[in-house]
């Protein structure tokens, strides 16, 4: 079992937990024997001192049993929490190796649920294994053994009852197991809906769509509740059936033992001991039933957790080159084709981008602009064709090396909680001169300087304490601070006014050593680019200067005319 690899690291604490629980169970097995002795010798002979001695023995058994149980609980908690912590660390590390294709399959809400809820279920199973699965078998086998020592014939009643209960428990476990897998998947759906609602709460309110979203959420929670009720009904059969079998066995024992008491082959105390041992078996089986319920949930969680741990990045890091030196033909696409699942997005793209060149990319929605630049850092691998950077195939570079030389600013601004300085300096330690240049080029210097704490100003989660334009400028500053050889700006100036956008484009032109790729919906934002790439349904239909495209490229002409006519109407 794969989980044993984690438990082995804590085998010392787990073993001690097992041992102390067995010690407690052994003491518990002694109680019926002492009670039988009290009845037969103490009460039977009216020996008060013997009864008091036995009473002290029972108190001693109880105290030591309590202490052993406490030690077991401590070691069980230590082991289960340690295993859970290590699982979470390994999962988090593995998730951070995932590429975009992995995250398309294992969604963020599902990963969060697995990282938290599923690991908790495994922790509980580990703790219960140490605390209960050591005690219950020992108690049951020990009770059967002690019962055989008292009366071999009556003990057969114990054996038959235990077999019936074991078969019943196993059957109910097999029937209920699929329900827990479905319940965990439904929890993923609920988490996904909740996350979407929390992220898009303003949009939902703006369109008065709360009722629809509430219905969506209620539908999935009802489905989850229905599955819980179904499995609850199945498992509810277990305890009553267990009590029925055990109590029926006790009645038979009392009835059958009456004859043996009459003929003197069995004492009254031994009958009481047999009943107590039957009750011990009942307790052990109830514990088994509860543990099996926990194991059912943990099995589903175990599969989901190890799916995360065993899912390898689809983009394999098998490159050998650890350095990247810019050359004249900085980026080359050679007959590149790509698609998501069954949908083709890019078709037979071939082009070259020179070192230090500023290239714009424009096209309609779904043209493949963002997809194209995502291939540069191997967020996805191509279906066919090759991409070369600095004279080598991108697959031949170490992933860390390749990504170190490419800096992205994505459409959706992503700022983490902390300070402006911490957000911008994510790629390397703080250097004042590089920071000032990054803020100046990104047009963020003025508004950051006006903040009372400057670059030490706090950033709340998602950068919600800044406007959309300010967030975009900070993410551009972060990308510039990296000083990568290739800078990709993916429609990241949409929230900037025209004057700020124009100033940004002018400053970017001054970065002569950096190869820049700018995606935008505005032709005005791309006018200064050395060349502009025009995509139409994943095909390259134009790649030239702004002026030349206006003459030769129909798609670019239509985009330009539609934007300028709108601006003209607005100005008019």
Predicted regions and their residues:
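Pre-NBD coupling/linker segments of ABC/ABC-like ATPases
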Residues: 313-326
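Helix-loop-helix
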Residues: 47-51, 60, 146-161, 167, ...
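Juxtamembrane helix-loop junctions of ABC transporter transmembrane domains
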Residues: 19-20, 27-40, 61-108, 112, ...
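An intracellular "coupling" helix at the cytosolic face of ABC transporter transmembrane type-1 domains
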Residues: 9-11, 75-76, 97-101, 117-126, ...
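Transmembrane helix-loop-helix hairpins at lipid-water interfaces of multipass membrane proteins
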Residues: 8, 14-71, 75, 148-153, ...
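Hydrophobic alpha-helical transmembrane segments of ABC transporter permease domains
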Residues: 19, 23, 27-31, 56, ...
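ABC-type nucleotide-binding domain
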Residues: 324-572
């Amino acid at each position: 079992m794969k989980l044993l690899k984690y438990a082995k690291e804590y085998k010392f604490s787990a073993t001690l937990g097992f041992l102390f629980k067995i010690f407690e169970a052994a003491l518990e097995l002694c109680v019926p024997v002492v009670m039988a002795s009290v009845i037969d010798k103490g009460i039977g002979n009216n020996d008060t001192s013997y009864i008091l001695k036995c009473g002290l023995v029972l108190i001693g058994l109880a105290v030591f049993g309590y202490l052993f149980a406490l030690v077991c609980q401590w070691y069980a908690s230590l082991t289960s929490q340690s295993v859970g912590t290590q699982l979470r660390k390994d999962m988090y590390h593995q998730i951070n190796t995932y590429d975009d294709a992995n995250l398309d399959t294992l969604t963020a809400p599902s990963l969060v649920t697995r990282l938290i809820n599923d690991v908790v279920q495994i922790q509980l199973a580990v703790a219960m294994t140490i605390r209960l699965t050591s005690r219950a078998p020992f108690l049951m086998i020990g009770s059967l053994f002690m019962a055989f020592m008292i009366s071999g014939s009556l003990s057969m009643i114990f054996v038959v009852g235990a077999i019936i209960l074991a078969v019943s428990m196993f059957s109910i476990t097999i029937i209920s197991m699929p329900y827990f897998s479905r319940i965990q998947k439904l929890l993923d759906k609920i988490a996904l809906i909740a996350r979407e609602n929390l992220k898009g709460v303003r949009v939902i309110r703006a369109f008065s769509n709360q009722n629809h979203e509430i219905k969506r959420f209620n539908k999935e929670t009802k489905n989850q509740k229905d599955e819980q009720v179904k499995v609850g009904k199945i498992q509810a059969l277990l305890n009553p059936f267990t009590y029925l079998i055990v109590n029926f066995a006790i009645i038979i024992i009392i009835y059958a033992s009456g004859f043996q008491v009459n003929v003197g082959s069995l004492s009254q105390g031994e009958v009481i001991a047999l009943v107590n041992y039957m009750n011990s078996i009942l307790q052990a089986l109830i514990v088994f039933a509860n543990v099996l319920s926990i194991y059912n949930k943990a099995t589903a969680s175990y599969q989901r957790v190890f799916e995360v741990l065993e899912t390898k990045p689809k983009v394999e890091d098998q490159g050998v080159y650890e350095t990247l030196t810019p050359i004249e033909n900085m980026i080359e696409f050679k007959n590149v084709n790509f698609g998501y699942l069954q949908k083709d997005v890019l078709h037979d793209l071939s082009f070259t981008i020179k070192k230090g060149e500023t290239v714009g990319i424009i096209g309609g929605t779904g043209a493949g602009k963002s997809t194209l630049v995502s291939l540069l850092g191997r967020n996805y691998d191509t279906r066919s064709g090759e991409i070369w950077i600095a004279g080598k195939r991108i697959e031949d570079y170490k992933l860390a090396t390749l990504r170190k030389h490419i800096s992205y600013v994505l459409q959706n601004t992503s700022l983490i909680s902390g300070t402006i300085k911490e957000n911008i300096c994510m790629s390397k330690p703080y250097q004042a001169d590089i920071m000032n240049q990054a803020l100046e080029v990104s047009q963020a210097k003025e508004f950051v300087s006006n903040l009372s704490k400057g670059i030490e100003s706090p950033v709340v989660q998602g950068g919600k304490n800044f406007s959309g334009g300010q967030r975009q400028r900070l993410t551009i500053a972060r990308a510039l601070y990296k000083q990568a050889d290739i800078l990709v700006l993916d429609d990241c100036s949409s929230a900037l006014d025209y004057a700020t956008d124009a100033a940004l484009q002018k400053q970017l032109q001054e970065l002569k050593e950096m190869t820049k790729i700018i995606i935008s919906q505005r032709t005005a934002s791309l006018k200064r680019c050395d060349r502009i790439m025009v995509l139409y349904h994943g095909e390259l239909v134009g790649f030239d200067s702004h002026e030349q495209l206006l003459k030769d490229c129909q798609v670019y002409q239509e985009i330009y005319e539609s934007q300028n006519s709108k601006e003209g109407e607005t100005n008019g």
